[in-house]
Amino acid sequence: MQPTRGDNVLDLVLTNEPFLINNVEVCSPFSTSDHNSVEFQIILNSANTSYKFSSKTVTSRPNFNMADWHAIELYMQNVDWNYVFSECTSCAEVSDRFYAVVNECIQLYVPLKAVKHGKAPKRHYPPFVRKAINKKRQLWKTLRKFRTPELTARYRVACKACRAAVNESEKRFEDSLVQNGNLGKFFRYGSAKFSGKKNVGALVDSVGVLTNDPTRKAEILSQHFQSNFTFDNLDNCNVRGHRSGQILDNVDFTAARVEKALNKLKTKTAGGPDGVSPLFLKRCKRYLSAPLAIMFGLFFEHSFLPFDWLLAYVSPIFKKGDSSKPSNYRPISLTCTLCKIMESIIKDEVLHYLVSNNAISRRQHAFIQRHSTVTNLLECSHDWVVCLHDHHSVDVAYVDFSRAFDSVVHRKLLMKLESSGVCGKLLAWIAAFLSGRQQCVVVEGFQSDWSAVVSGVPQGSVLGPILFLMFINDVTDDPVNKVSLSLFADDLKLYS
């Protein structure tokens, strides 16, 4: 038995099952504590659990960071896409031929890497922090063998130096976030610091049983997300005809547009169900923009989407509250990058048309250029201050639509789009984009069964937010007398 604070044994591991605990070891103190940490293993036999530890689940995937980019660019440069597509008689064949060329290139010049699921990613510190950590560890090992006042003092100095190095590293990173000006990264960092919840905890199923099996957790969340869907009651919604007289029924896919969309890809994001990395597409944009423009044009003309484009890997994101309740998680869909590229071109065209023709309510502040939570708050604050200045009271009601993104009925959404002037081939392609979708939930690398998506717009897609705006757009029609309202996506404020 080893001491855990000075020469005293204060920290104990107690169990009524001696065979449950293994490899008890006294290690270095945690953070700023003056107690040594105690590490041990809990052994669970196959009778107590129905799954293997996810930390031992290893899969292989392409490591695009180690790809031979010179060979890849040379390979893609020599592809005769006119010949590749020449004998295709359907959109499905065009898709298959394109993916065959891309996948062959990836297999030839992109090495595989082993990926362990269920393990938290290692933190990557700069060299000066790693040096301080290693020095602290070495002194700790020496101190365990020769406990002298001199070594104890040196170890304490090393601990302080290590903490200072970590704090300096964090400070430099936060300074770089501020100077970079990327608001998305800044708010994601802040949100992660305050929430502290990244993974899926143990979940309670429908009969009240708590489980930590990742496969079972994926199934529980999948069933919950399915329960959020809304089935069409077949009632016709009252839609108003668009007032401008303009229509949007076509989108042109040019090589220049496709290359521009490829150039905007974030290379550190994951690929979707088709396995094609955004990094690969962006690095090969000069050679892929022309064939993709041809392919997108054919898909648009025939209202076609490849099978993989209708699939989504759903990552459950914890919101707040009790982490064991499935209702406190929201689904974020990971879809194919190529589909997102086509969506982005369509989205730009649709959004420009809607804004130019005042088809989106001016009270909506989400997903529109030069609109944000700031403009939403400024508008409301201005109205409230004016009322108070005129010695009037202000009553405010906050409305949150439950499961708003998941409850969008596709048929009614298409009716509202058509009433705003979106029609023809464009409306037909959007209908194909929404229908026949499937999703599976992924938890710690384990997947649920695939399930049909009968309503909603995919959260995580490019077109999804704009489609949702059009679905909720008429909530601002026919306002109650002397009642104003303001929207940010599905968050509604009513005030008078």
Model-assigned labels for residue ranges:
Residues S37, Q41, N45-A47, W69-W81, ...:
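Surface-exposed loop/turn segments and immediately adjacent short secondary-structure elements
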Residues P479-S486:
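Conserved helix-loop-beta segment at the catalytic/binding core of cyclic-nucleotide signaling proteins
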Residues V396, S486-L487:
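Hydrophobic "anchor" residues on beta-strands that sit immediately upstream
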Residues M1-V166, V209, K260, C339, ...:
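A shared catalytic/ligand-binding motif for oxyanion handling
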Residues K116, L151, R172-G181, N358-I368:
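Short, glycine/acidic-rich hinge or "gate" loops at secondary-structure transitions
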Residues Y75, V101, C105, A132, ...:
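Alpha-helical recognition domains of nuclear gene-regulatory proteins
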Residues A218, F225, L248-P458, S496:
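Conserved pre-catalytic core of RNA-dependent polymerases
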Residues V9, W309-A312, L487-D491:
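Short Gly/Ser/Thr- and Asp/Glu-enriched loop/turn motifs at secondary-structure junctions
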